[in-house]
């Protein structure tokens, strides 16, 4: 199998978390709540990427305790022959502002581009016949997107909108669950890069600025993979200095892709985790990366996932492709994997991640990886020690642990 012919998954409902049914603790969303002083929310990045702090949770043993370190010390913790796996996605300038054709203000967040064939043709024919906003005869591939909408009144089918001071015009041509399907009369991605705003997290409580355009992207993103609406934030700590130190020590690097959706910020709205519907995101594990992972484990070395996005890709691919629970193969498709305590990890040995929002699926994932008790203690220590939280905050390095 080659990278150009990955295994695909057309029905993401087939992806089910590999949980131990005997573990029924920590299924209430309230189990993942905590109080965070507002001043510990990092709303701006540090001057240097790798200047952040690093809280290390080593493998549990009788004397195991958290260790306070600097992120620049990461190469000293890892061993030659270990493999670091990054997410090489790039964040779109996906936020747009403008007006509906009725004059009301509107905010649009592009979630992902979709194909013309995904749109109900009956809708499209009717809208083309009645549209007064845009020339719908030139709607084509790369002109249609699933979007989140903020407006005083809901956008109606066939309603037009004018965005970015008139540089972009569009029309609502359908719905997909809680998302709106918008069609534009020009290709979307070039317009976003010129007129859009980087969709920094809502808890920053500000608009994106020029610094964010650089610092809310990883240094190794692939420009061709412009499709995320949030950064893989664990990777934001890496700069050329740290990458060079890792290479000098003989630590390998590889890449996967997961295009991060706005669902990463969505709260869990059900009291019981088992009733939560996980958002879906496109993911890709190249065959070359799968082979490196297989070889790393065969050599007795560790695979380090940089962030929850990488973890979700690798563990999804493990469920879909691993032969006898061992060898991975290349894979691509949509993943809606939901990882919470009781999950049995098949690939990841260490996880580098940031500190996550209360009651979030990301906090549930790290609790599954390092145990709920260890994460609670680590967060208490981090708050007491004035660590910086969330996307621009400090990092944690977790060893896979078991209760």
From Swiss-Prot:
Family annotation (InterPro entries): QueA, QueA_dom1, QueA_dom2, QueA_sf
Domain of life: Bacteria
GO biological process, one term: tRNA wobble guanine modification
Compartments where located: Cytoplasm
Cell inner membrane among keywords: no
Function description: Transfers and isomerizes the ribose moiety from AdoMet to the 7-aminomethyl group of 7-deazaguanine (preQ1-tRNA) to give epoxyqueuosine (oQ-tRNA).
Protein name per its UniProtKB record: S-adenosylmethionine:tRNA ribosyltransferase-isomerase
Native species: Psychrobacter arcticus (strain DSM 17307 / VKM B-2377 / 273-4)
Name of the gene encoding the protein in the UniProt record: queA
């Amino acid at each position: 199998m080659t990278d150009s012919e990955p295994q695909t998954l057309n029905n993401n409902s087939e992806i089910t978390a590999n949980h131990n049914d005997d573990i029924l603790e920590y299924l209430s969303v309230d189990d993942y709540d905590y109080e965070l002083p507002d001043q510990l929310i990092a709303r701006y990045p540090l001057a240097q990427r790798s200047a952040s702090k690093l809280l290390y949770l080593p493998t549990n043993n009788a004397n195991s305790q958290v260790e306070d370190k600097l992120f620049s010390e990461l190469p000293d913790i890892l061993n030659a022959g270990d493999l670091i796996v990054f997410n090489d996605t790039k964040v779109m300038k996906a936020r747009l502002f403008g007006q509906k054709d009725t004059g009301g203000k509107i905010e649009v967040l592009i979630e992902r581009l979709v194909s013309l064939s995904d749109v109900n043709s009956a809708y499209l024919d009717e809208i083309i016949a009645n549209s007064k906003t845009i020339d719908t005869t030139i709607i084509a591939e790369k002109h249609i997107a699933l979007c989140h909408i903020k407006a005083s009144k809901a956008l109606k089918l066939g309603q037009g909108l004018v965005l970015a001071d008139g540089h972009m015009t569009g029309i609502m041509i359908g719905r997909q669950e809680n998302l709106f399907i918008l069609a534009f009369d020009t290709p979307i991605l070039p317009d976003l890069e010129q007129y859009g705003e980087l969709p920094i997290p809502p808890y920053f409580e500000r608009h994106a600025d020029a610094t964010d355009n650089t610092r809310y992207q990883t240094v190794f993103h692939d420009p061709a993979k412009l499709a995320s609406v949030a950064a893989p934030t664990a990777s934001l700590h890496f700069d050329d200095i740290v990458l060079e130190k890792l290479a000098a020590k003989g630590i390998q690097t590889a890449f996967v892709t997961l295009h991060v959706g706005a669902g990463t910020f969505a709260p869990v709205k059900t009291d019981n985790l088992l009733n939560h519907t996980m958002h879906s995101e496109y993911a890709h594990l190249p065959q070359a990366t799968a082979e490196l992972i297989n070889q790393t484990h065969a050599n007795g070395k560790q695979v380090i996932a940089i962030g929850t996005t990488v973890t979700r890709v690798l563990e999804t691919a493990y469920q879909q492709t691993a032969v006898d629970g061992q060898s991975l193969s290349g894979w691509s498709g949509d993943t809606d994997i939901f990882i919470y305590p009781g999950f049995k990890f098949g690939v990841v040995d260490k996880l580098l991640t940031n500190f996550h929002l209360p009651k979030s699926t990301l906090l549930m994932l790290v609790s599954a990886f390092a145990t709920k008790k260890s994460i609670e203690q680590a967060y208490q220590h981090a708050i007491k020690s004035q660590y910086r939280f969330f996307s621009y905050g400090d990092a944690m390095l977790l060893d896979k642990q078991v209760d």
